[in-house]
Amino acid sequence: MAFAISAMMSCEIETSGNGDLDGFWHLVRVDTLSTGGMCDMSGRRVFWSVQVGILNATDYDRYHKGYLFHFDKTDSSLHIFDPYKDNRTEGDIKIEDPSELYHLGINAIDETFTIEQLEGSRMILATDVLRLSFKKM
């Protein structure tokens, strides 16, 4: 009995501090800022999943395992970096060519997004080139 009580007292609930960012996000729209172009992504299966310090970006129509990133978040920015292609059976593969990430709305190996909106079920991220709109699932 004493062991059970001491074990329970030593447990702490871990929180990420990510707030509304944590969760499963569907990329529903990509705007190209320089041209004013818009791409409706709502019919595509591109998702970003965020938990603690890992972001997993997956295009289920192309490659179902996804890409893993570390990230840093402030109130106004999301910095993603150090991408790896998920390959658990043989070891994750470090991404060196950013073109491998374009279909996910990511244009660089190390990229910082301005958080234009992050509340409830809506997130909008922007760079100098793109604006990404997400819906939380």
Predicted regions span which residues?
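Short beta-strand segments
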Residues: V46, Y67, E111, L130-S133
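Short, hydrophobic/aromatic-rich segments at coil-to-beta transitions
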Residues: D22-F24, Q51-N56, L118-I124
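Short, surface-exposed polybasic-and-hydrophobic patches located at secondary-structure transitions
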Residues: D40-V52, K135-M137
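Sec-dependent bacterial lipoprotein signal peptides
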Residues: M1-E12
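Edge beta-strand at a domain terminus
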Residues: H70-S76, L118-M137
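Long, contiguous N-terminal structural blocks used for assembly/anchoring
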Residues: V28-D31, F47
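Contiguous, well-ordered beta-strand patches that form the walls/edges
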Residues: D31-M38, S42, G53-L118
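N-terminal helix-cap/turn-to-beta initiation motif at the start of protein domains
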Residues: C11-H26
